[in-house]
């Protein structure tokens, strides 16, 4: 029996994990084992919201060392993280400034300024990327405007996964799927767009040409002295999650559910027409030249903040209490910018309900109900937008990532969207990370080949839409009201 042992480092906004994957060639089976799990989160430092990259690096090394201490031969390592954030280095490879997080307020007003000076349509035609106030394009402009004293010292700008790969190997790389999240990569050339870079104030010399997933960046030398290849996987965690989504046919959509919810479909060509621009659709890079045509949704970040503020430790109990409440009494727009990083999430949610003359969610369960119903309704709206964009309805939705364990939200999503939902795999980003490593090791042919492995080894659960549910009736009522308004217009 031939085995491959691959290690995936998967960093999310709230936690990170080092996972060991064992692939058996003859039976094409893949098993995962968690080696080390650790917390991640936002920190306040010198007036900025930052990441503790030193702590994250220590946790990564601890996890890798644990694998080596077990005497396991590691065939390769891959790292994926969230998008848009970066670390600046000087000529000697030392950090310049702070690793500022995307939830920091330093970019306030800069997205509007870019649209005014460059033109919203021109930016979109160049990048194909949705407008989000924390995109790297605006973060770099904030840096160069607010901290000009740092500029003479900067030699390199590495996105988060590339930074951690650099720390392991001493080699620099700019991986394509994550680079596209910056809104700085030209959608036609797959290279940095000089006009957008110039507006940001960044020097093009800070960046190398983006490389597509699958190349070996360099080698990590383990404590035993072995050189282990570090592979440039699809290093944006959503890109990895989509690779592991067992999409079957052109009518399948995906929803990567975690701190963020990212809903979309795969395409061989980008969508950059006026309809896509109006809907703020993004065309992020994927593996094998595919595009991830999707939309960002604020996701379970709202719930995470409520759990933290209310000191709730028993999530299953909260979900059970939430499920017992009537649906759609408290509805908010989870994508409202006021929810990006408020001082108090509970108070912000209550304020929106108060301002819109709705009942006020007071209890933990009511806040949970508000979040779950609002997310499911937004999922339905976004899925409808995506279907209109491509001119074909979807027949099923694959929910992957940690959020797919929330069976209540899965059923609400199926009911609101009116289509079959398939939940799983949970560790989608980790699996997609492993998939690219196995392709680099010549164990698998391509993404479709890997998805067959996932379909046969992952635990998948199907949720059938219930047209008689409260949320389904609510959606039908909304559609009827919209149609009436359109007829009367």
Curated annotation (Swiss-Prot):
The active site is at 237 (proton acceptor). Disulfide bonds join 68-222, 353-370, 413-417. Substrate binds at residues 83, 236-238, 296. ATP binds at residues 13-17, 259, 304, 402. GO terms for molecular function: ATP binding; glycerol kinase activity; rhamnulokinase activity. One of its GO terms (biological process) is rhamnose catabolic process. CDD domains: ASKHA_NBD_FGGY_RhaB-like. It comes from Escherichia fergusonii (strain ATCC 35469 / DSM 13698 / CCUG 18766 / IAM 14443 / JCM 21226 / LMG 7866 / NBRC 102419 / NCTC 12128 / CDC 0568-73). It is an enzyme of class 2 (transferase). Involved in the catabolism of L-rhamnose (6-deoxy-L-mannose). Catalyzes the transfer of the gamma-phosphate group from ATP to the 1-hydroxyl group of L-rhamnulose to yield L-rhamnulose 1-phosphate. Monomer. It holds the Pfam family FGGY_C. This is Rhamnulokinase.
